[in-house]
Amino acid sequence: LNMNNEKARFVWFPLLIAVAIAGGILIGRFFSAETSFGKTARYDKIESLLQCIEQQYVDTVNRNDLIENVVPKVIGELDPHSAYIPAKDLESVNEELEGSFSGIGIQFNILNDTINVVSVISGGPSEKVGILAGDRIISVNDSAFVGKNISNEKVMKNLRGPKGTTVKLEILRKTAKNPLFYEVTRGDIPVNSVDAAYMLDDKSGYIKISKFGKTTYDEFITALSKLHNQGAENFIIDLRGNSGGLMDAAINMANEFLPANRLIVYAEGKAFEREDAVSNGTGTFQKEQVVVLTDEWSASASEIFAGAIQDNDRGLIIGRRTFGKGLVQQQIPFRDGSAIRLTVARYYTPSGRCIQKEYQLGKSEDYSMDIVNRYMHGEFFNADSIKQNKELVFHTVNGREVYGGGGIMPDIFVPRDTTGVTSYFNNVANEGLLYQYAFDYTDKYRDELSTAKDVESLLSILEPNTLLNSFVQYAAQKGIRPRPVYINISRKLIVNTLQAYIARNILGEEAFYKLLLRDDETLQKARDIVNKGEGYPELPAENQVPR
């Protein structure tokens, strides 16, 4: 397949970078200095207040501390996604979407107050010097790095750093009698967003996307090409749990499936003139069946992609209603290195739907409870429980009715699967024991497990009964008493989860999803639909537009 890697040329936010983040859709991450805060012709009550306090208040106070306390409160009176980002946090907040960062190239966890190397990134700095999965880091730059004060934030702060700088590590390894010492030169570490891409059968390919970052589109094209070369004629794109990221990644992805001159998304606001993103016709996969999987945590850029596919009648959305996050934000820097992300517009799907759900100014706590309320109302389990405003009706290009009011409603609803979920399973899952046991098991039997080169050979080692009985004993030692009836009900779920975690430790993310999703009802529904050739929406007889 001759893949077209040239990114689509869109009529879209000229000179600005469009980004979807946890706070909504962000534009202008590197906004010009002229827009930063500085001079103002208006009377500034806050500035006058600060001067008054500095000059006349009985005690000495720190002006910067006062400002750092006041600004978040002001922003908190706006919508739930406008945000203030202190200077100390801005770099790490931006880093998630950059596609890479400078570090040593390991994945780690903290168990028993110790940093455990879960995996070493192939080709990364740590692999080059000989660090292995299962190693324990006990000191960094000659300073002890164990104990209850160790946190993920502290580890990342010390292991990450400018490219080309070095960090000294002291390592414990089970096969070594004495500690090992390494000096690692930091390098660029990719932040991958396509977690898995594999064939479900002879004709259907599956792609799991966890976020939308700077490299997502290129990763997506690579995944599509790989699956197409393996015979894929249908594509199932899993956006469940994907809270968003870079908007242009979602736009370019949608462009791959759409003919020319199709609206993908547009944005508009009070002081923000409407801007459209339109497909350019260079997409390579304009005819194949496409199904998009969504759930209540699919948000922002995920909703842009799903909305473009749905409103253009290009494919089906299967799963549950999405989050409903559709605010466009502009990042405006302060001179001290901090910034605000201010909502300036809303984005709309091609049919004109605003995906943003309702909110009240200054009521972020109520807003954050929406997911809980949806759960309690039964929306995750019954399509009839979903609240839809029938007055906000819109139409796809071929005349199908779709509704606004918040989120993307799936074409085919699949309830949350509760098969095998018991109080025992919830207890061991909430305590993190499934993950911890899988790591300990991997560490104990790493040599034997490492002989497995694929999922099938790994499963031949992981005998279900032995694994389950061993885990129940482990959980009992951690304070979760055995409950035979519930354990039997949750048996398959526990074993599948343990095998998936162990597979991740040995074979990586793709193996993890292959095992975790073996019995996934939403994925199975999508697979059945495309295998029957029913991956296109049922269209009204009149006013059909050619795909």
Model-derived segments and spans:
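Short, Lys/Arg-rich N-terminal segment immediately upstream of the first membrane anchor
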Residues: 1-9
